[in-house]
Amino acid sequence: MESGTGHFSRFECIVAGTPISSQSANRERLRDWKQSVRQSARAAWSGPLVREPIYLKVTYFYVGFDGGLDNDNILKPVQDALEGVVFEDDHLVHIVTVIRCNLDREFAVPTTSRNVVQALERRRDFVHVVVDRLPAFEDFP
């Protein structure tokens, strides 16, 4: 990756488990969730910190009930955990997509990510995190 040049490689990782809301009263569980995200990110990312505007996509795949988690409460702990591991500062996150996907429903998986396919085969809750270059404005839905 060439930091600051727009030429970094797309980053992705899988975080096993159910996300903990940023609004959780159980601060220890929230801290543990952020640590899980950091560990997964460190295992998948060996490049220098990204120092340019980025696109962050967080997809929560779950079985059964999603726990009533709001998208913004899923996003915040993940974004906080990636800061200082993948990207320098969260102000670099210019575009965000958060998706909740119930594994009990039939759906087409719009990905060629081997990591996602392998995680789906386990039929357990997980979060797929992607950090990528900003798309051209006209290319974004």
Protein language model features and the residues they cover:
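Acidic, proline/glycine-enriched N-terminal capping motif
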Residues: M1-P141
